[in-house]
Amino acid sequence: MAAVRAPHVEEQRADPRAFAEGQEASQRLSPEHLCELVEAQKYEAERAIASLRADWAYWWDLWANRVRYPGKEDWQSTMWVPKPFAAVEQATALTQRSLVDSPEFFGIDGGDAPSKVLAKVLWEPLTKLALGECGFREKFVDGAKVGYILGLAGYWKFRWTMTMVPTLMGASLDGVTGRIVPSFAKTPRSALALDFVLPWNVFRDPDSRPRDPFSGSYIVHSEWKDRALLMRMIDAGWDRDAVEKLLATDGTSSASRTMTNSQQQQAQRRQQSWERHKFRKSYLLDEWYGDVLNEHGDPVMPDAMMTVSGRHVLYGPAENPLWAVDVNSGRRKWPLIACSPLVHPD
């Protein structure tokens, strides 16, 4: 069987018709191939930094003062000055005081006089409001703290969300009790949301370059999610048949070769025990961004996204909804932005 082919990547980025051909070609790829592609890339990313991930676990325990030294009694192991913890807390406090507690921790400027005025009276206040509503200041400090512990602060994930909120429509007087009874109606409200993602849950192309968060050919964000979220995402355009087939399983097969013990490890970092009641089932979802490759490894569709779980393609391949383009790589930006206070030069 001949491999699925499409116009060249650069041609697809320049010509909408060529991109449509590439998107159509990606739809002809089997779900088994797409799931295998995501799994292979995740496994590649995980194995490439396996030793670093082991160091993360050690450094986390070192910061939490959970280190035991062989050849010493328990009381001797615990009788030490927690210098890593103190250093991290002091650095975090300095970051918060110098960057976050300041009312002018960032600014927006323009190139000419009209744009400067527009930036001052519109864009800067609007951006500050959006960042304040999504908790950017607090999550920035959390990321800096993780960065001082691990050397990698993790990832900030910006997304646009919409929810239904109650809005006061009026009030009436209760003739029996004399109380004022308000009336509400559900109205849609959209807002900027920000998730802070720990580095354990992100699998990035090992060929990515430092200080260039959109380099590399793929990035995967993996999270365990409950059944309720998957059922709700059917109305958001996910594949109903694929979601229902996934929900018919117990969720254990969705982990495949990666993150098989991630829930237990996350609970251990929180100093918790991992136990779930029999009515709660969770499934490992992989949100993938990158270039879709065919059976021979040739790019079929650039700047794509899809969501898979185990052997089920729940959404996509679809066009990356972010229209911002990274000038260094020429690709669409993905919503995950990495940051590190301790940058490795290579």
Give, region by region, the residue ranges found by the protein language model:
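Extended, helix-rich architectural segments
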Residues: 1-345
